[in-house]
Curated annotation (Swiss-Prot):
It comes from Burkholderia ambifaria (strain MC40-6). GO terms for molecular function: fumarate transmembrane transporter activity; malate:proton symporter activity; succinate transmembrane transporter activity. InterPro entries: C4_dicarb_transport (IPR023954), Na-dicarboxylate_symporter (IPR001991), Na-dicarboxylate_symporter_CS (IPR018107), Na:dicarbo_symporter_sf (IPR036458). This is C4-dicarboxylate transport protein. It comes from the Bacteria. One of its GO terms (biological process) is L-aspartate transmembrane transport. It is found in: Cell inner membrane. It is a multi-pass membrane protein. One of its GO terms (cellular component) is plasma membrane. Responsible for the transport of dicarboxylates such as succinate, fumarate, and malate from the periplasm across the membrane. Belongs to the dicarboxylate/amino acid:cation symporter (DAACS) (TC 2.A.23) family. Keywords: Cell inner membrane, Cell membrane, Membrane, Symport, Transmembrane, Transmembrane helix, Transport.
Length: 429
């Protein structure tokens, strides 16, 4: 097959669009801020099909399972994996902040901080208790779940729908075939919308730089650098070790999903690449049933980047305001963060709202301290989203391997760039 010219390759177009967006935002900020609808429009187009795609993928995956116990087994393994890896992410955030101490030297007096700017985030955080979160998973109506684009609600409906179809067997085959065909149509729509990714990335990046300016990063550059460095270490060391044990290379995996990562980088939304990620994972040898269960669930329960950010941000505020936290308080912070981070993707301004919820349970640190990082949160959200999407991709491959539903030949071929492979199963990639 003839190779595409480099300028027609999607990730090259996205990189170029991001660079142009940065230039426009820096030199013509007023014009750049007007580009925001381009980024918002692209994300809305993607979100338009996320709900139906998750529903169809999960339903066809479960309907194709002969043993319904398998659904519970896959879900249980996924949740166990999420909890263990999330704990590593939280601990790494704490450790990195202790070692690099990005907040030391600020000497901020908490009494001088104006908490009005974060009041709305704090209010939302207080309004989301554990019981509220669990009840929120149950939609008022099936239509309402799709209309609001609530991933966990759609996942619940899909689990019930798929379970019934699996129970019906041949009698439900007509419905299963219809949903399978609908899945193909929806992914076709995604392919069309994805071609607009450079425009969306340009608009989102131009707005960010135009509104906040590169100069606004300088005073808090140490925190941003610490967060990005810690996230890279997490991906290469923690996820890299998990990947190596499972039998593939994290570097090759990241390279395989580079188009999805660039879309996330440009839009600062991990949801913008969810449909493409699911399709890529299936092509890489993960079974549809595992992809359908693990990826959507991971978007609420496996937010590795958000976990690193939360413990790091809390400790940064403590350091900046010269507040010493005891080890017991830090263990409390860790335990609270493990709970507040779950379901964060279902809330607007997720990272900041979860941070407010965590701080509310550690009264030693003033909630008004969030003002210190409010201005740079937008610049850190890209790294959160990138780490989250890599983490969910790795989780899906790992759970597929645990279930012995990972086609290693397909995985090896995909990560090698689509070259020919032997039919014998590879020991590693």
């Amino acid at each position: 097959m003839k190779k595409k010219p480099f300028y027609k390759v999607l990730y090259v177009q996205v990189i170029f669009a991001i660079i142009v967006g940065v230039i426009l935002g820096h030199f013509y900020p007023a014009l750049a801020t007007d580009m925001k609808p381009l980024g918002d429009g692209f994300i809305k187009l993607i979100k338009m099909v996320i709900g139906p795609i998750i529903f169809c993928t999960v339903v066809t995956g479960i309907a194709g399972m002969e043993d319904m116990k398998k659904v519970g087994r896959v879900g249980g393994k996924a949740l166990l994996y999420f909890e263990v890896v999330s704990t590593f992410a939280l601990l790494l955030g704490l450790a990195a902040t202790h070692i690099l101490r990005p907040g030391v030297g600020f000497n901020i007096d908490p009494a001088t901080l104006d908490g009005k700017a974060v009041a709305s985030y704090a209010a939302k955080a207080h309004g989301q208790s554990t019981v509220d979160f669990l009840l929120h998973i149950i939609p008022n109506t099936m239509v309402d779940a799709f209309a609001q684009g609530e991933i966990l609600q759609i996942l619940l409906i899909a689990l019930l729908f798929g379970s019934v179809l699996a129970h019906l067997g041949e009698r439900g085959k007509v419905v299963t075939d219809f949903i399978d065909g609908l899945t193909r149509v929806l992914f076709g729509i995604v392919h069309i919308v994805t071609k607009l990714a450079p425009i969306g990335a340009f608009g989102a990046m131009a707005f960010t730089i135009g509104k906040y300016g590169v100069g606004s990063l300088v005073p808090l550059l140490k925190l941003i650098g610490t967060f990005y460095l810690t996230s890279i270490v997490f991906v290469l060391v923690v996820l890299g070790t998990i990947a190596r044990v499972t039998g593939f290379s994290i570097i090759r995996f990241v390279s395989y999903i580079k188009e999805e990562l660039l879309i996330v980088l440009g839009t600062s939304s991990s949801e913008a690449a969810l449909p493409q990620l699911m399709e890529k994972l299936e092509k890489a040898g993960c079974s549809r049933s595992v992809v359908g269960l693990v990826v959507p669930t991971g978007y609420s329960f496996n937010l590795d980047g958000t976990n690193i950010y939360m413990t790091m941000a809390v400790l940064f505020i403590a350091q900046a305001t010269n507040i010493e936290l005891t080890w017991m308080q830090q263990l409390t912070l860790l335990a609270v963060a493990m709970l507040t981070s779950k379901g964060a993707s279902g809330v607007t301004g997720a990272g900041f709202i979860t941070l407010a919820a965590t701080l509310a349970v550690v009264p030693t640190i003033p909630l008004s301290g969030m003002v210190l990082i409010l201005g740079i949160d937008r610049f850190m959200s890209e790294c959160r989203a990138l780490t989250n999407i890599v983490g969910n991709g790795v989780a899906t491959v790992v759970v597929s391997a645990w279930e012995k539903e990972l086609d290693r030949n397909k995985l090896r071929q995909a990560l090698a760039g689509g070259g020919e492979v032997k039919t014998t199963e590879a020991a590693g990639v």
